[in-house]
Amino acid sequence: MIEINNKVDFIFYTNGTPNTYKIKLILLELENSHGITYESKTIDITKKENYSDEFVKINPNKKVPAIVDQTGEKPIIVFESVSILIYLAQKYNTFLPDFKTNPKENSDVITWSVWQAANLGPAFGQFFHFSYFSPTVQEYSLHRFNNEAQRVLRLLDDRLSVSPYIGGNEFSIADIASAGWLLYLNFVPFYNATKERFPNIFKWLDLIGQRDAVKQVNQQISEGFKNFSTAGIRALFTNDPELINAKAPVGIENVVLKYD
């Protein structure tokens, strides 16, 4: 049985990571444009709260983000970040062109949203994991995900050379999907992603950075770095105290790609 809080429209399960920032962004946008209300519930993965019986009822995949829509007669659970984006965009008829009247634009936005979840997110996440959180150096994994992260950045920069926004001419869930990961470039030069190498990505970051919701999430990301814990994350992957407290293969400020 899902606990209902009738005081808010949505319950948002989060933990302040890239995929959850996507949902934070769209909820802030909808709060500004449609007056929606929501309650954030933090799931501490370092304490394995995502494996609790209560949370598994929300998401059997044991990951955040997830939402519970409480606006109808019965609550509706949605998990997986891009699924949530599509659900909310369709529900409020915003950030996603209508399929019946604009099938090409609709397809472009959904395609680039799914592209992020299938390509950009996994490449960035795995490269960052093996660079910083892995208790041991794994050269093959670093090389593999270095190449993939480099590839997706180049592809996205090319896309943004012909379109101001990722999904087309208007801000959409395609932008929100990638922003969850790429907003970090405003604070730390991960992947050695500079304006010189990827001018169109940084032009896009400046463009979306003018939005109030993005400004708020940027502030949260900045604050999040103050509470960053390598040991806490590593505890998810090993019980060995020496490995948990070992020096990272590289420092957080030096997670960079090696360019050809």
Curated annotation (Swiss-Prot):
Taxonomic placement: Eukaryota, Amoebozoa, Evosea, Eumycetozoa, Dictyostelia
Any one GO cellular component localisation term in the record:
cytoplasm
Query: What is this protein's record name?
Result: Glutathione S-transferase domain-containing protein DDB_G0280881
Domain GST N-terminal, by residue range, is: 7-96
The record, for Pfam families, names: GST_C_2 (PF13410), GST_N (PF02798)
Alphabetical list of PROSITE patterns matching this protein:
GST_CTER, GST_NTER
One annotated GO molecular function: glutathione transferase activity
Extract the InterPro entries matched here.
Glutathione-S-Trfase_C-like (IPR010987), Glutathione-S-Trfase_C_sf (IPR036282), Glutathione_S-Trfase_N (IPR004045), Thioredoxin-like_sf (IPR036249)
